[in-house]
Amino acid sequence: MHYYFFICLFIGAVLGAAVPIPDNDPFYKPPAGFESAAPGTVFSNRPVSSGLSGVTAVQVLYRTTLINGSATATVATILTGPQSTGTKLVAYAGPEDSVNTTCADSYLYYTGTTSSSSTLGPDTAAILATGATVVVPDYEGPNSAFSVGRQEGMGLLDALRAALNYAPAGLSKTAALGGYGYSGGAIATGWAASLQPTYAPELNVKGWAFGGTPANVTSTLQNVEGTIFAGYAISGLAGQMAGYTAAQERFTQISTAAGAAAIAKARTQCSGSDLTSFLLANFETTKYQTLGNRLLYDPAVVSVLLNGTMGLNKAETPTAPIYMFHGKYDEVIPYASAQAAANAWCANGASVEFVTETGGTGHLGTALALGGTAIAWLDLRLGGTPPAAGCAHVSVFKLGIPLKRAGSATAIEIFGIGDVNIVADMERLHAAGKPVPGLFSYAKWVL
């Protein structure tokens, strides 16, 4: 989910007709016969603005795969910084969290509006600073299939292939590869890790780092219904309909006028507007569809949602090392679901370092507290340093100061809000064994 939920990326209306939107832009259309090309094949390219000083950016249209197995094409933006060596490549999955192609990262780069995203510039800059080249894919695909993890994972893996295939990027064919994503971006990264051994076994992947992971779409939908994050539920369901014909057909049968209008509206805007439009909405009621609170138990719905649950299939166990981080009191993405996926992978032989943030930073704060540590961990893997053997569960407190273990990154991210009274209150609750609320709940203390 887009953890900077107060940012609205709906820029199409502001830009007007001067720049074509992806649906009307010929650059996004693959050539005739593209279906026979191998996944990761590059069809066209164009330069764009990176929004970062000294960083060059080029967009490539490449072949990838839809959830139904058919061929499609999507766009990725390749970033090369002054420190990029050509020996390391990281796929960055931004938290798009929407079902509108104007919300895709490629459109932000093309229109020069990357500053409208709170994460795109800082995250990619941090990765570029390690000497890696970064590829930022529109992993949802041309149908904006938000929350359809398998399709997103294939889109990310094919972006790595495309970057390697694009010779002007200057990447070594033996470059060390990795991926990073948080929240909605962790759907794509987690599924890329799961599918890589079978879908893209030739890729030289050295590690994956992701956090705030919606490992179970069903539990995530249930968690945000009726809350200030309810917009994610509606856009997530709309994304399932965009990916699965069966889901769209079933919703057409059971939707009310209000439900159809909500899905239609979600398809015209980005995550910030979704959160505003659907504040406190509960899609699991008869206001939106005739099944009411039985919606997620409907066989057609269960089928597609189960297909998006990480860790259920032993054959999809990641083989490259993983760094997962999640806030114990994440108010958006259920902690237990992410932990369950990690445990399942570990039981099947994966190497996972699962970091639990117990300091009460919540969904947003955990990203700020541990994102830098995750990127540092990933850089160690790409640099050839092996992780500690096997799986480990690491606890973190002090508002994001991680406890150390062999093989962990040396960087320490310290996150705080500067008020000793707030810190003391959090420590008091923690010591008493009580839940520590997210930082936003303390807003009244500092306003």
Annotate each predicted stretch with a short phrase:
Residues 13-85, 447:
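Catalytic-loop region of hydrolases
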Residues 78-80, 86-98, 102-110, 208:
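Short beta-strand element of the alpha/beta-hydrolase
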Residues 119-123, 146-169:
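Alpha/beta-hydrolase active-site loop
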Residues 161-232:
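Primarily recognizes the serine-hydrolase "nucleophile elbow" in alpha/beta-hydrolase
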Residues 211-315:
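Accessory cap/linker subdomain of secreted extracellular hydrolases
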Residues 299, 303, 339-447:
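C-terminal catalytic histidine-bearing segment of alpha/beta-hydrolase fold enzymes
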Residues 318, 322-330:
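Short beta-strand/loop motif that positions the catalytic acidic residue
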Residues 328-333, 364:
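Acidic catalytic loop of the alpha/beta-hydrolase fold
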